[in-house]
């Protein structure tokens, strides 16, 4: 089964880590993660103030990144060298891994990177972003009483 994870990054800024006179790093991050061995279908959304939502067939989780996490994410986004980022990061030996289809919108220009999970995690510029998604994925669902 082929897995697909779609990341959409719209640049604007994280309030907790960007001063008013600085150029903002991003505006909103939206991620659609599907496939894998378990056939997952998860949607992520992270706003500039660090608020996040994760939705799946099991339910919805809402939360807040702490200031350090928001800063790490903002710095990771600002640190991507778009001139050196390959459009495709794929390892033909990788099977049944997540696939990432990432869209990065900066002003009027869109950058797209497709990658399998292994290759994306080994890319120093993308790895901090993927690790933040893993952190959000681990937030437990609240049990209704």
PLM region descriptions:
Residues 2-3, 18-36, 68-69, 76-77, ...:
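Short, well-ordered, aromatic-rich surface patches in folded extracellular/luminal domains
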Residues 5-14:
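Sec-dependent N-terminal signal peptides
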Residues 8, 38, 53, 72, ...:
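A broad, structure-centric signal for solvent-exposed, well-ordered loop/edge residues
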Residues 14-16, 42, 49, 57, ...:
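Short linear sequence elements within intrinsically disordered, low-complexity coil regions
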Residues 22-63:
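N-terminal secretory signal peptides
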Residues 57-80:
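Acidic, aromatic-enriched beta-alpha/helix-loop junctions
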């Amino acid at each position: 089964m082929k897995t697909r994870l779609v990341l959409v990054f719209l640049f604007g800024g994280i309030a907790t880590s960007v001063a008013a006179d600085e150029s903002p790093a991003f505006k909103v991050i939206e991620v659609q993660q599907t496939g894998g061995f378990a056939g997952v279908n998860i949607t992520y959304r992270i706003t500039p103030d660090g608020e996040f939502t994760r939705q799946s067939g099991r339910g919805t989780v809402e939360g807040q990144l702490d200031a350090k996490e928001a800063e790490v994410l903002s710095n990771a986004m600002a640190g991507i060298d778009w001139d050196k980022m390959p459009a495709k990061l794929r390892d033909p030996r990788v099977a049944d891994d997540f696939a990432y289809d990432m869209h990065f919108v900066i002003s009027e220009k869109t950058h797209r990177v497709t990658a399998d999970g292994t290759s994306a995690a080994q890319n120093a510029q993308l790895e901090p972003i993927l690790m933040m998604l893993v952190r959000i994925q681990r937030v437990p669902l609240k049990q209704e009483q």
